């Protein structure tokens, strides 16, 4: 989960309260969220869904249904896992609060571990639990598979970062290496929160790369 800057313009289909998944809404959310699932960070999203941060409960809360600020770009896997009562409230709005400031996103070997930095911040705690679940939930065979797909994709990104950091150690003035690192650490990149957290936690080795974390 990464901080997102929304387009303020309200799509026409939302203004008219026709539907929340018409083409204009889909394209705006896809653009604003960089075609990444806002929960797990996978990119591109092959099975996108428009997720309501606060559920509308089949129209019980109609004001939530067409509120652009309540609509998020999600993959089906994460939307399914978030659809539990414990996540009806207190999941971070990543357009309002910066998850990187509040949560540590770590990959240790092939294990994803996500933890709130402040255990008294209920939104950070609940969000960390949700992100942990989308990478680690094993209650059905399909979820085991889909979690592993995300871990595998995350491993590819982390390995690309580590390989590039090795090249950077021996050739830090290489324009190609610098550009590659900037791309890997950009907010728009897949699983950016994990890669950026790695660099921040090793900034004694790479102090100048903190400038790449935009």
Segments predicted by a language model, with ranges:
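Phosphate-binding glycine-rich loops and adjacent basic patches that engage nucleotide phosphates
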Residues: 32-40, 119-123
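Short, charged surface segments at domain edges that flank catalytic/cofactor-binding sites
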Residues: 1-36, 59-66, 161
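C-terminal, charged low-complexity interaction regions
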Residues: 132-214
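Conserved, surface-exposed functional patches that form binding/active-site neighborhoods
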Residues: 86-169
């Amino acid at each position: 989960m990464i901080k997102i800057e929304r387009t303020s313009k309200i799509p026409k289909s939302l203004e008219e309260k026709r539907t929340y998944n018409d083409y204009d809404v889909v394209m705006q959310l896809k653009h604003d969220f960089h075609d990444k699932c806002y929960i797990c960070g996978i990119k591109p999203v092959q099975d996108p869904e428009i997720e309501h941060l606060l559920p509308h409960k089949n129209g019980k809360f109609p004001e939530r249904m067409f509120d652009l600020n309540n609509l998020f770009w999600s993959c089906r896997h994460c939307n399914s896992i978030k659809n539990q009562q414990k996540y009806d409230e207190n999941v971070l709005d990543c357009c309002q609060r910066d998850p990187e400031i509040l949560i540590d996103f770590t990959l240790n070997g092939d294990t994803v571990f996500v933890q709130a930095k402040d255990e008294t911040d209920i939104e950070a705690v609940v969000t960390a639990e949700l992100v942990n679940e989308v990478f680690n939930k094993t209650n059905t065979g399909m979820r085991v598979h889909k979690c592993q797909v995300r871990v595998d994709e995350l491993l590819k990104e982390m390995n690309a970062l580590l390989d590039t950091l090795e090249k950077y150690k021996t050739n830090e003035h290489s324009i190609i290496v610098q550009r590659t690192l900037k791309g890997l650490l950009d907010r728009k990149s897949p699983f950016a929160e994990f890669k950026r957290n790695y660099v921040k936690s090793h900034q004694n080795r790479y102090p100048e790369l903190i400038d790449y974390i935009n």
